[in-house]
Regions:
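Glycan-processing catalytic domains of CAZymes
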Residues: 1-190
Length: 190
């Protein structure tokens, strides 16, 4: 804040997907503490959606018991209701849902954020969950689909996980540099 102009806010790094027991109280306490020690600087969270691609620790590419859009809306309505006074923005990770679900989930996320006066961003994952190899840089067409869905839903900001490995020209993955170049070309960046 006032002491260091380069410090503009807080990322509350607990990543959840559903209404985990105690999460509302925990996020509220962390958000309040961040605001209290910094004179009210903004806070944000970046949860994941418990979609069909949420298969960590397995050899599967998808799962059957994914959260529905309606369940997601119900659970996050309750979470946002309990944290909106100390959490200013939410950037849902987009990699655990399928491409044909982006619009439905993004629309619900934006609606809920607007209801509670929160900012709604996207966290565009730049690695591919559709491959049997964990993890390679995503193809630009897939990244573009995610960003366009976020734009259709009215999001005004996008962050990414994870630039240094999956999109940086300095990455060990040659594809990462190509993804970066395609991104720059698409957005006419020098």
């Amino acid at each position: 804040g006032e002491k260091y102009k380069s410090f503009g806010g807080w990322y509350i790094s607990g990543e959840i997907s559903r209404k985990t027991k105690g999460v509302i109280d925990a996020f509220h306490a962390m958000g309040k503490q961040c605001k209290d020690v910094s004179g009210g600087l903004p806070t944000f969270i970046s949860p994941w959606i418990d979609g069909k691609k949420a298969v960590m620790g397995t050899d599967k590419l998808t799962k059957e018991d994914a959260v529905s859009v309606q369940e997601h809306e119900r659970e996050w309505n309750e979470i946002f209701d309990g944290i909106h006074d100390v959490v200013d923005a939410c950037a849902f990770q987009d990699g655990h849902i399928d491409y044909d679900e982006l619009d439905a989930f993004f629309t619900v996320n934006k609606k809920l954020a607007d209801k509670y006066g929160m900012k709604c961003w996207t966290n565009a994952e730049t690695f591919d969950r559709d491959m049997p190899i964990d993890f390679l840089p995503i193809k630009f067409d897939k990244l573009r689909m995610k960003l366009e869905a976020a734009k259709r839903a009215g999001y005004d900001k996008a962050i990414t996980f994870e630039f240094s490995h999956f999109m940086s020209p300095q990455s060990a993955y040659l594809q990462a540099g190509h993804l970066y170049n395609r991104y720059k070309d698409f957005f006419n960046l020098k």
